[in-house]
Amino acid sequence: MSLSNLPTEMVNPKTRNLDARDTFEILKLINEEDALVALAIREVLTEIDKVVQMCINCLEKNGRVFYVGAGTSGRVAYVDAVELIPTYSLQEGVFIPIIAGGTQALGKSVEGVEDDEEGGKNDLFSYKPSEKDVVIGIAASGRTPYVAGALRYAKQCGCKTALICNVRKPLLAEYADVVIAAETGPEVVAGSTRMKAGTAQKMILNMISTTVMVKMGKVYDNLMVDVMVLNEKLRERAQNIVTHITGVDKQTAEIYLKKADYNVKVAVLMILSKNDVEECRKILQDQSNLRKALQIAVR
């Protein structure tokens, strides 16, 4: 399929004469088109669920999840992956973003790198992927050579693979165990896939990583109980989480957080189980899921 025939490259009939419209009308059109993104994602929830299960199985075997993309797709990958570390105390090197052109491409456009299929292979090769790992390629067009190189090599290494794209029947489907094709259609500005396509990619990656973290025991109720306390805002958030779960006041929450070295799970377990800090650490070392740890400790 030629580039001009891809839905993401087609002219959107709803936004013709865009340059002649007033500012508010342009904003209204963009908003209306953006509203279609969530509807497109609803159609691929089954495929997203398959990728979530794939990632959970991977992490349970101490594998890694790679995101691979070029341009907007690569930048979106970085935004999702790096935030998992402070939000869920995830160690570095578990969710790994790879962008065509390297990290310099995060802050500026590096031309031509998305066409380097061998570059995609080599960048993934540097991490020595194995059958324990999952590689998720991200490409609005479903055919980006850089992503193709990475996915093809991932299959050769025995990795589980997935493709997130915005077109039906993408060329790279042959290298993916699961294809998530969120058909977002023509952009407000024809071909500007940083808009609806990029938004869809960000939403899907958020859904995948968040659900994986929930199922890996890093959320209790709907609270980020593995949050890293790195600044004053996060310190107050940790206090609020402890207060919400245990019912103690913020001053008491702070006392227990200090005893627990600002580990929210340990602080909660200390308060509700009446065990000391070392005993709570031991319980959580054996059972990191707070809900299950509480069932063990509070009897």
From Swiss-Prot:
Catalyzed chemical reaction(s): N-acetyl-D-muramate 6-phosphate + H2O = N-acetyl-D-glucosamine 6-phosphate + (R)-lactate
The enzyme's E.C. designation: 4.2.1.126
UniProt GO BP: amino sugar catabolic process; N-acetylmuramic acid catabolic process; peptidoglycan turnover
Active-site residues, record numbering mapped to chain: 83, 114
Keywords on record: Carbohydrate metabolism, Lyase
PROSITE patterns: GCKR, SIS
Similarity annotation: Belongs to the GCKR-like family. MurNAc-6-P etherase subfamily.
Note: A lyase-type mechanism (elimination/hydration) is suggested for the cleavage of the lactyl ether bond of MurNAc 6-phosphate, with the formation of an alpha,beta-unsaturated aldehyde intermediate with (E)-stereochemistry, followed by the syn addition of water to give product.
Subunit text: Homodimer.
Entry function: Specifically catalyzes the cleavage of the D-lactyl ether substituent of MurNAc 6-phosphate, producing GlcNAc 6-phosphate and D-lactate.
This protein's name: N-acetylmuramic acid 6-phosphate etherase
Name of the gene: murQ
